[in-house]
Amino acid sequence: MEALNALMFQGALLSDSGRLYRLQLPGGDVQVVERWSGSERLSGGFEWWVDVLSTQAGLPLEAWLGRRATLYSRLADGDESPRTGLIHDAYALGSDGGLARYRVGLVPWTWWLSQGRHSRVFQERTLVQIVEAVFADYAPMASWQWSEETSAFLAQARPRSHCAQYRESHLDLGHR
């Protein structure tokens, strides 16, 4: 009976109702946020680290990598403000007394563009064709589109005779 009461108490503590923050993970699984921190930069993306508590040890952390997760912050009026990113790192911090603690790192999809160096040559391709070819590898995680304001400019852009990507990241090529 005492063990059952302890489990019910833990379940009540780990409810996300009334909490300021909650993290929705792949598959709709919601975790209670213990704390979170991060940084955001203009033209540089963001990185958030979220510590969550769970009654389950051994959550499938590897399966979360590259998947979308949303950190919700409850506002003063009761509405929620979402911050969505892709999980680039997840690991267990330890467990104690039936609670497991995990840390999850969230970044924008463009972070993956910075991972790795590539070399390739584009010939007689427009800017649109080059960018779309580079971003095609990231289609499952990418969330982007050309803005309407750029359509007139892009329609006038002539093909480039030669554009080389030599040992640089896709992000660096995109910035260039």
Residues of each region from the PLM?
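Amphipathic alpha-helical and helix-coil boundary elements used as assembly
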Residues: 1-176
